Amino acid sequence: MKIITLPDELNIESLQPIQIFDYCSTKEIAKQQIILNQNTFSFLIDGNKEVVFNNSTLSIDNSKFLIMKSGHCLMTEKLSVIRNYRSVLLFFSNETLLKFIRENELNRNKLSEFKSVYSFKYDEFIHRFVASLLDISKLSKSIQKRMLEVKFEEVILYLIEIYGTDFLFSLSEKSNALSQKFIQTVETNWMNKLTLKELAFLCNMSVSTFKREFEKNYAESPIKWFQNKRLEYAHHLLYKEQKSSSEIYFEVGYENLSSFIQAYKSKYGITPKQHHKD
């Protein structure tokens, strides 16, 4: 699968610190490897969107919009009932973000966690804001540049007023140290049914480097570790939540019931059904 770099590969004449792109598609994509070279608002209009980052995963319909940190992610786009996908994208550089924080003298809060993607619900203000972006996109490039600087400040100030500054400082946070980022990626995504290639992409590593780093941190192979984690979670669902094997096998990463039962018996010595009897 080809890696897509945004906004570089969009039909934009020249890259700017703040820029807009009205993205429309009639094709679905699943776990497309994306490199975001700028932070990005995705104002979803039609369809559904899911993004997976190293430290967070979000799915939205067109009642919400996303703001995403620059970096690596896996993106899924699903068409609406009218077989359409549309998202108004507003890109902005890290320099633009840091300049805004400095000029507005915002105080950095101590965050318990840093996330690479946030979702917010649409309201009347945001609906009007998106409509104004579409109007601006029809103007000359020189006017667009000046007006988008104002519009960027407008939407960030509004979101801070409603939601506080946590999202802003998460976006401005520098990347974690390599080992910390690696562990965070694994621990956040072990239930997301990602391939080793997809996990390695989120860590900006080759698959072979990912495997070496994994064994260094976890002292066993990725396949064995992920299988054990999922079986332990299955054990929790069977015991604590009293669910049946047929209800959970797909959720914990197995394509069919028989392979789940076989793996469970291999780990615990008895079948899930025998566990229920006990």
Predicted regions: what they are:
Residues 111-124, 137-192, 197-202, 216-224, ...:
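Short, Lys/Arg-enriched, Trp-marked, Pro/Gly-tolerant hinge/linker segments that flank
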Residues 1-16, 30, 139:
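A short, N-terminal "cap"/entry segment at the start of jelly-roll beta-barrel domains
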Residues 14-110:
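N-terminal regulatory/effector-sensing and dimerization cores
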Residues 184, 188, 193-198, 205, ...:
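Terminal helix-turn-helix DNA-binding modules in bacterial transcription factors
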Residues 125-129:
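Short, well-ordered alpha-helical segments
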Residues 63, 210-214, 259-264:
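Short hydrophobic/aromatic patch on the recognition helix
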